[in-house]
Amino acid sequence: MARVTVEDCLEKLDNRFELVLVAGKRAHQLQSGGKEPRVAWENDKPTVVALREIAEGLVTAESVDNPIADRSADVDELALLTQSFGE
């Protein structure tokens, strides 16, 4: 289980208040089953998974607030996977 720090997350977001809001919204999405995690779950709580996603740059304030932006990120990820498998 990789440790995530606030400093890791603040490199991706403007301030700690935005971090709290984004992490809370993302954790709620994960907990309710509305969204799939973008990192390995590793038996962590949804809040930890949300912070790990933010620290890795996989989740942004825009993608949490705007489901269309989140879907376009999924499409980009799918395109990369398709290219890597040569299909």
UniProtKB/Swiss-Prot annotation:
EC number, as in UniProt: 2.7.7.6
SMART domains, alphabetized: RNA_pol_Rpb6 (SM01409)
Statement: the UniProt record of this protein carries the keyword Hydrolase: no
Classification via Pfam families: RNA_pol_Rpb6
Record's keyword annotation contains Isomerase: no
Keywords noted in UniProt: DNA-directed RNA polymerase, Nucleotidyltransferase, Transcription, Transferase
One biological process term in Gene Ontology: DNA-templated transcription
Record's signal peptide: none
Quaternary structure, from the entry: The RNAP catalytic core consists of 2 alpha, 1 beta, 1 beta' and 1 omega subunit. When a sigma factor is associated with the core the holoenzyme is formed, which can initiate transcription.
PANTHER family referenced in this protein's UniProt entry, alphabetically: DNA-DIRECTED RNA POLYMERASE SUBUNIT OMEGA
NCBIfam families in alphabetical order: rpoZ
Function: Promotes RNA polymerase assembly. Latches the N- and C-terminal regions of the beta' subunit thereby facilitating its interaction with the beta and alpha subunits.
Protein name according to UniProt: DNA-directed RNA polymerase subunit omega
